[in-house]
Amino acid sequence: MAKTNRIKIKLISSSGSKHFYTTTKNKKNQINKLSLKKYDPIIKKHVIYQEKKI
């Protein structure tokens, strides 16, 4: 079987609300850490989520 190029990552809220999303990313194409603006349902606002490994 072929080795997968995708790794699981956790996107953690920068607001400190302990909310997170999980997703995968291609480790060969995306070398830098991922940072996305997503909705945080705990504080009911859009905030920046930053990548951490699972």
From Swiss-Prot:
Q: Which domain of life is it from?
A: Bacteria
Instruction: Kindly give the InterPro entries that the UniProt entry links to this protein.
Output: Ribosomal_bL33, Ribosomal_bL33_sf, Ribosomal_zn-bd
GO biological process terms, alphabetically, are: translation
An annotated Gene Ontology molecular function: structural constituent of ribosome
Pfam families recorded: Ribosomal_L33
* GO CC annotation, single: cytosolic large ribosomal subunit
Report the family membership: Belongs to the bacterial ribosomal protein bL33 family.
HAMAP family membership: Ribosomal_bL33
Name-wise, this protein is Large ribosomal subunit protein bL33
